[in-house]
C-alpha cells in the first residue's frame, strides 16, 4: 500500500503503458514471493479498481490445500508505504505489520519476535538485521550482475515467466 508515486519523472508511474501501475509497482512483490515459496497457483481470482486518482488490486491465489490473498493499492494522498503479511497455520497465526512480528498461538498465547536478534544483541536498527535495506541489496546485486556480465541466479527464469503471466492477467 502506498500513496500514488507523484515523484516519478514525467509522471511515468501513472502511465499504464510505461509502468504497469499497481500490479507492476507493488503487487509484483507479493506474487514474486508467493511463487518463489509456494510455486504457481492453481487458480487466480482478482478484482481491480482503477481511476485517475487511485489503483487497487485484490487477488485470491489458490494452491493445493491453502489459499493466499493479496491487496495492493495506490491512494490519492500522502499515504506512507506499508508492507505486511499474515500467515495462518494449523496451530496459530504469524503476522508482520508496522515493523513488528507477532505470533498468535493456539490456546490464546501470543508473543512478539524481533527477527535476527541473537543472544540479546541487536544491530543499530533494533531488528538484529544489517542496516542495509532490501532496495540497496537488490541494486548492488543488479550492478554486480551487469559488471560481471552474469545472469541473475536469484530469480529462476521459469518463476519470472509465471509472475509476469499472472500480472498480465490482472
For each predicted feature, which ranges?
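Predominantly a Rossmann-like dinucleotide-binding segment in NAD(P)-dependent oxidoreductases
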Residues: 1-47
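Active-site rim elements
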Residues: 19-22, 125-130, 149-153
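Conserved loop-to-helix N-cap of the C-terminal "lid" that shapes the substrate pocket in Rossmann-like
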Residues: 24-27, 132, 154-160
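Substrate-positioning beta->alpha
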Residues: 29, 53-56
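NAD(P)-dinucleotide binding in Rossmann-like oxidoreductases
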Residues: 48-54, 63-137
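Short beta-strand scaffold segments in enzyme catalytic cores
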Residues: 59-61
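C-terminal helix-rich "cap/oligomerization" subdomain common to oxidoreductases
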Residues: 137-170
Amino acid at each position: 500500500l502506498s500513496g500514488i508515486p507523484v515523484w516519478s519523472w514525467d509522471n511515468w508511474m501513472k502511465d499504464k503503458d510505461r509502468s504497469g501501475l499497481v500490479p507492476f509497482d507493488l503487487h509484483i512483490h507479493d506474487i514474486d514471493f508467493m511463487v518463489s515459496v509456494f510455486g504457481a497457483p492453481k487458480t487466480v481470482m482478482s478484482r481491480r479498481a482503477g481511476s485517475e486518482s487511485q489503483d487497487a488490486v485484490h487477488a485470491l491465489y489458490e494452491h493445493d490445500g491453502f489459499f493466499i490473498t493479496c491487496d495492493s493499492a495506490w491512494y490519492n494522498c500522502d499515504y506512507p508505504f506499508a508492507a505486511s503479511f499474515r500467515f495462518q497455520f494449523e496451530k496459530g497465526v504469524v503476522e508482520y505489520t508496522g515493523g513488528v512480528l507477532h505470533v498468535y498461538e493456539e490456546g490464546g498465547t501470543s508473543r512478539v519476535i524481533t527477527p535476527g536478534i541473537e543472544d540479546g544483541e541487536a544491530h543499530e536498527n533494533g531488528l538484529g538485521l544489517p542496516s542495509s535495506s532490501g532496495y540497496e541489496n537488490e541494486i548492488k546485486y543488479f550492478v554486480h550482475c551487469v559488471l560481471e556480465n552474469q545472469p541473475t541466479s536469484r530469480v529462476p527464469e521459469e518463476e519470472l515467466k509465471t509472475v509476469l503471466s499472472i500480472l498480465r492477467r490482472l
